[in-house]
């Protein structure tokens, strides 16, 4: 009978994706059990299992009943065919099926095939390979198969004795998965196939059921275990075998019998099909350990050893002539190398298939965010990220669609999934002399961590169960508890880089890390063609093209492209600075900022110049120093005016008038309509609106700053001039940051800090040329242009250049005729504030003379008036005290 490959129809909506192999699963239990395959597990062997109530097949060659079975969590495995079942009742029903298949059947006339029942997404259907009929149970399918066997008298049915069990890998499809299992028979009469004799036909027919999950992309061969799949793929590439594995391979080849030849390969099936294969003939196991055990039990090791198959070009050992021929073809035809990731392939078709992965050909687009996916299942899993109720939510506020990412994130929290405190974790490799982070000064005693014990759990564990002390979950076996604690509550760095020895949590992290050693960047950006070494870095880079910032601060509304940047930003709002300098007491919320700060105390910077004794804090400053001072080059040039600068920082500080005139002012304030040239200026302008309050409007021109108290123009009060003092309402104070000295308000913390230097006299920015100090760094930059002779601000009308932008603004008023500064006394206007200040000094002198004259007249008239003046010459009379005797003369008293 020829073999007909049947496709498996899936009715499951996959919701869970494995982060290691990107395989999809439909339930939580499946993905948890599958992820155990990526973790080193302990295997147990059940030797000599015998149950009088169950018919167990024995090995006819050795007469022994030794079976090896892998113990799975909460599963029951049939010792005859290796199938995994979910409950004891299902195991009993399954074993009854084997008993019915082994019972002899009487010849009954063939019946017409029954009508196939309708498909259902909640049951498992069994399909007949002859008439394509579907059945809802194994009993119906078995009875129907007997009708086909009775209709063919030339091939009478014979009792079936199942071969030795196959050690299955991690289960992918369970008994309750809504999948149609399609059965198929291997081709009979193939090359090397054992043809049973007439006597053997009436006694035994050895049948084996295998679950094939892994498909080779080169030759479409199917495999059951990942170890066999990887071993097979190594035969397609010319790679030497390590010395440690060569004796084991030679022993396995010698133990094999020359009569054992692989059966012809079946028709290739899609890699995603969960299909079973029935083979007639000698049972051929896919697992090397099971195959070696069966050979030892059957006595095949004593047979004649097969000839060792070595490659004459690279001395590589192979298990079969077919594998050797495939390997020799790679030597004859050569290999094909990928130009993007340097992988080699034995054929052009496999290379083209691999290049399709780099081209990111995705046909399923998300209508919300525009991301593309290769399969519809991935798109459906992504679409849940846009729904208001994600599948997995963490108490810290994060939500996840992928279960694996949620489990990895949950391990970053403390015991029981409680979020850790916001104190940043110090680096893994401590810096020499680096202090420990100081505890937060909150004024409250730090609560001790409660001890984890059985008394703090929900209650005593039930007899015969094992309880987890961290989450109070109970298990029936100690092995399950151990695996639960290792997989859920502890994140071990089990994967090591073979080059630098660094440990990682996942294999994918190791693969991405290895590209840092090799320099590979196989993931180019489709927008700017910039390559990256991992898909995560590419996805993070693409946010710069789309402008998307998914992580937003709930306090100030500022958005970020990475969650780590948002966490660091939240420390600013929390005023939590755990890293404190031991010398000056300054605190920082990042450890590297404290490390940089400590260099200022020592005076020795880490990067020293080899040609001169100067040292620098940053490497780029050292490179600029060597390039400019020792090499005499100025590589950074302004594209508008052609001015050359030694560093990119100087070029950014260079305010080119030509570029400023050409640059459009695209940022407009939504409150007053003012346009500015950058987003930073717009943000500062809107902050000024917020500090002013909702009812006030900012002036187009900044108001003239108030004169210092010592030089303020003395305006005679009505009381001093003999008039009547009228109470004027105090102006409403605007909201903002207030100076504790003069009660002046500011919109930003930076402006307040700069203003406080006026009261403290601090000038932290000295000029390295003349030693003059300034309160602001911008004042120092403007001052240094006097030494360098640089005049970057040129007038576009007459071409006159200035070193300070304020001087250019004053000069432009000559051409425009604008005079924005007017005197409040006489109404005369001026182009600059300095000219107005000089003019107001004339009014101050007139006011001072008038006040002195009035005081002299009052003193002469009364004779008892005493004028108190300050020690310093003040422009305004601050106090005029007139003794009570002056009231009789009708003089107004002010005090």
From Swiss-Prot:
A zinc finger (C2H2-type) spans 16-38, 76-98, 126-148, 214-236, 309-331, 336-358, 364-386, 392-413, 466-489, 495-517, 523-545, 551-573, 579-601, 607-630, 636-659, 667-689, 737-759, 765-787, 793-815, 821-843. It comes from the Eukaryota. GO terms for cellular component: nucleus. Residues 239-301, 434-460, 687-732 are annotated as: Disordered. SUPFAM superfamilies: beta-beta-alpha zinc fingers. The modification Asymmetric dimethylarginine is found at residue 831. Disulfide bonds: none annotated. Keywords: DNA-binding, Metal-binding, Methylation, Nucleus, Phosphoprotein, Repeat, Transcription, Transcription regulation, Zinc, Zinc-finger. The modification Phosphothreonine is found at residue 724. Residues 274-287 have a biased composition (Basic and acidic residues). PROSITE patterns: ZINC_FINGER_C2H2_1, ZINC_FINGER_C2H2_2. Residues 707-731 have a biased composition (Low complexity). InterPro entries: C2H2-ZF_domain-containing, Znf_C2H2_sf, Znf_C2H2_type. It is found in: Nucleus. The modification Phosphoserine is found at residues 164, 298, 717, 728. Its main location: nucleus. One of its GO terms (molecular function) is DNA binding. Residues 247-257 have a biased composition (Polar residues). May be involved in transcriptional regulation. PANTHER family: GASTRULA ZINC FINGER PROTEIN XLCGF49.1-LIKE-RELATED, ZINC FINGER PROTEIN 200. Belongs to the krueppel C2H2-type zinc-finger protein family. This is Zinc finger protein 574. The gene is ZNF574.
């Amino acid at each position: 009978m020829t073999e007909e490959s049947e496709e498996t129809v899936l009715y499951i909506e996959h919701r869970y994706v494995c982060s290691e192999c990107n395989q999809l699963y439909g339930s939580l239990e499946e993905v948890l059990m599958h992820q155990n395959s990526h973790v080193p597990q302990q295997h147990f062997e059940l030797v000599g299992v015998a149950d009088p109530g169950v018919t167990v097949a024995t090995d006819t060659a050795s007469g022994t009943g030794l079976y090896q079975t892998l113990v799975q969590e909460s599963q029951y495995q049939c010792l005859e065919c290796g199938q995994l079942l979910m409950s004891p009742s299902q195991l009993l029903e399954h074993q009854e099926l084997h008993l019915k298949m082994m019972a002899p059947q009487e010849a009954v006339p063939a019946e017409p095939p029954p009508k196939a029942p309708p498909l259902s997404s909640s049951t498992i259907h069994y399909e007949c390979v002859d008439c394509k009929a579907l059945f809802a149970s194994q009993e119906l399918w078995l009875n129907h198969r007997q009708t086909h066997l009775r209709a063919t008298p030339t091939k009478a049915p014979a009792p079936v004795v199942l071969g030795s069990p196959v050690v299955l890998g991690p289960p992918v499809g369970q008994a309750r998965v809504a999948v149609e299992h399609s059965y198929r028979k291997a081709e009979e009469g193939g090359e090397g196939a054992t043809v049973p004799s007439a006597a053997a036909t009436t006694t035994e027919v050895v049948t084996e059921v295998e679950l094939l999950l892994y498909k080779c992309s080169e030759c479409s061969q199917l495999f059951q275990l990942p170890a066999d799949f990887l071993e097979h793929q190594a035969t397609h590439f010319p790679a030497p075998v390590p010395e440690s594995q060569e004796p084991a391979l030679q022993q396995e080849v010698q133990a094999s019998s020359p009569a054992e030849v692989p059966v012809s390969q079946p028709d290739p099936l899609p890699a995603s099909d969960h299909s079973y294969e029935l083979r007639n003939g000698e049972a051929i196991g896919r697992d090397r350990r099971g195959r070696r055990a069966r050979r030892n039990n059957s006595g095949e090791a004593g047979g004649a050893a097969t000839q060792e198959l070595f490659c004459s070009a690279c001395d590589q050992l192979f298990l079969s002539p077919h594998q050797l021929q495939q390997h020799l073809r790679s030597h004859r035809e050569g290999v094909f190398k990928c130009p993007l990731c340097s992988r080699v392939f034995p054929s052009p078709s496999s290379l083209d298939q691999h290049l399709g992965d780099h081209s990111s050909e995705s046909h399923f687009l998300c209508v919300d965010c525009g991301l593309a996916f290769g399969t519809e299942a991935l798109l459906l899993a992504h679409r849940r990220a846009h729904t208001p109720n994600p599948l997995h939510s963490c108490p810290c506020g994060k939500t996840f669609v992928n279960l694996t990412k949620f489990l990895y994130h949950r391990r970053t929290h403390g015991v029981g999934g409680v979020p850790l405190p916001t104190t940043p974790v110090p680096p893994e490799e401590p810096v020499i002399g680096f202090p420990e982070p100081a505890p937060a000064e909150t004024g409250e005693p730090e609560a001790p961590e409660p001890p984890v014990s059985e008394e703090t759990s929900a209650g005593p564990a039930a007899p015969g169960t094992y309880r987890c002390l961290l989450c109070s979950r109970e298990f029936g076996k100690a092995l399950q508890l151990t695996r639960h604690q290792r997989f859920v509550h502890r994140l071990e760095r089990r994967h090591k880089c073979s080059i630098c020895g660094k440990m990682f949590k996942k294999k994918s992290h190791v693969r991405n890390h290895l590209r840092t050693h090799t320099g590979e960047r196989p993931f180019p950006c489709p927008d700017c063609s910039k390559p990256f070494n991992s898909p995560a870095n590419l996805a993070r880079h693409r946010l710069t093209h789309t402008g998307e910032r998914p992580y937003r601060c709930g306090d100030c509304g500022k958005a970020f492209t990475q969650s780590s940047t948002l966490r660091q930003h939240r420390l600013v709002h929390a005023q939590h600075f755990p890293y404190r300098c031991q010398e000056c007491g300054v605190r920082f919320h990042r450890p590297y900022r404290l490390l940089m700060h400590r260099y200022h105390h020592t005076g020795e910077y880490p990067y020293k110049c080899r040609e001169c004794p100067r040292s620098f804090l940053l490497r780029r400053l050292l490179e600029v120093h060597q390039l400019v001072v020792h090499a005499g080059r100025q590589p950074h040039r302004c594209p508008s005016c052609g001015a050359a600068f030694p560093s990119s920082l100087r070029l950014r500080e260079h305010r080119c008038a030509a570029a400023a005139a050409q640059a459009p002012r695209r940022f407009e304030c939504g409150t007053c309509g003012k346009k500015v040239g950058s987003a930073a200026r717009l943000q500062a302008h809107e902050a000024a609106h917020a500090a002013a309050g909702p009812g006030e409007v900012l002036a187009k021109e900044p108001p003239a700053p108030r004169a210092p108290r010592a030089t303020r123009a003395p305006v005679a009060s009505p009381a001093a001039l003999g008039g009547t003092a009228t109470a004027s309402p105090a102006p409403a104070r605007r909201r903002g940051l207030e100076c504790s000295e003069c009660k002046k308000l500011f919109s930003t913390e930076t402006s307040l800090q700069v203003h406080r230097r006026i009261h403290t006299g601090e000038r932290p920015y000295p000029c390295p040329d003349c030693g003059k100090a300034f309160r602001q760094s911008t004042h120092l930059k403007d001052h240094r242009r006097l030494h360098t002779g640089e005049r970057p601000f040129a007038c576009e009308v007459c071409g006159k250049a200035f070193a300070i932008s304020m001087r250019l603004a004053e000069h432009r008023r000559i051409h425009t005729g604008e005079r924005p500064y007017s005197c409040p006394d006489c109404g005369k206007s001026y182009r600059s504030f300095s000219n107005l200040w000089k003019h107001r000094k004339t009014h101050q002198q007139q006011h001072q003379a008038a006040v002195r004259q009035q005081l002299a007249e009052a003193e002469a008239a009364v004779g008892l008036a005493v004028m108190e003046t300050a020690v310093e010459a003040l422009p305004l009379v601050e106090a005029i005290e007139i003794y009570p005797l002056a009231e009789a003369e009708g003089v107004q008293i002010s005090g």
